[in-house]
């Protein structure tokens, strides 16, 4: 905040803001282990960051506050239930300070859409506070804090394409030689990740939903930069559960392929569907046809891979 007479030096409080841009993710490959005794599932996944981004602006303030605008903003809490708020508290605790910042999130990543938007926002807050407060917290410490917040948060820091294991938080960079073109179809309503996991457990108890092979061929297709090679290898063991809970997803997946996409997949726990296309022009055509097909709420065209959470405006005096 600035003094009413404009003389900020008299405040003895640093002022300014930092804006961080952070991408959503698509899981190109997602294998889910059986439920463990602690309730978690071991994952093997290939994360892919795409150019659908949230912008998170953090300013110094008297107290911690959170405001959201944009895609699905009215569906999210603006208090300690929000992962971005928790990230601010965790970073402040890590450096022994009070979390006195205001956070503004301009959302484009769908809420409860299987693209890790909440995790992305949390990662962005860590990066923004590190820059705003000039903390120079090392990258390895940021990764540790990210993992404490949730299993998708480390990848939002990492970006690009990565192989995730454990609960998804243990990452290894994957070579991706090309820009891949995507159409993202947002569903009318969200799916809770916990509900999709529970449905997957139920389906496995009563039957044998599809299991994926090893991710090696997916990694080879990414290294080759070939969308035609990658398309038939896209796989998500949570897809059957997501479709079971929201049968309209099957129609959306079918419509995308009929519109000319190489392949379609439910992203993560859904319900966002991601369609791989041969080119930028093909993605525009597929997106236009999907928009008019009545199978989804909104369509976005995106590319990947893109970088993880990064500062787009450094600390500035206000």
Curated annotation (Swiss-Prot):
One Pfam family named in its UniProt record: GHMP_kinases_C
Enzyme class, UniProt record, top EC level: transferase
Chain coiled-coil ranges: none
One term of GO molecular function: 4-(cytidine 5'-diphospho)-2-C-methyl-D-erythritol kinase activity
Binding site for ATP: 110-120
Single biological process term from Gene Ontology: terpenoid biosynthetic process
Lineage top rank: taxon: Bacteria
Keyword Nucleotide-binding assigned: yes
Keywords from the UniProt entry: ATP-binding, Isoprene biosynthesis, Kinase, Nucleotide-binding, Transferase
Miscellaneous information on this protein: Was identified as a high-confidence drug target.
Function: Catalyzes the phosphorylation of the position 2 hydroxy group of 4-diphosphocytidyl-2C-methyl-D-erythritol.
Protein name: 4-diphosphocytidyl-2-C-methyl-D-erythritol kinase
Annotated organism of origin: Mycobacterium tuberculosis (strain ATCC 25618 / H37Rv)
Primary gene name: ispE
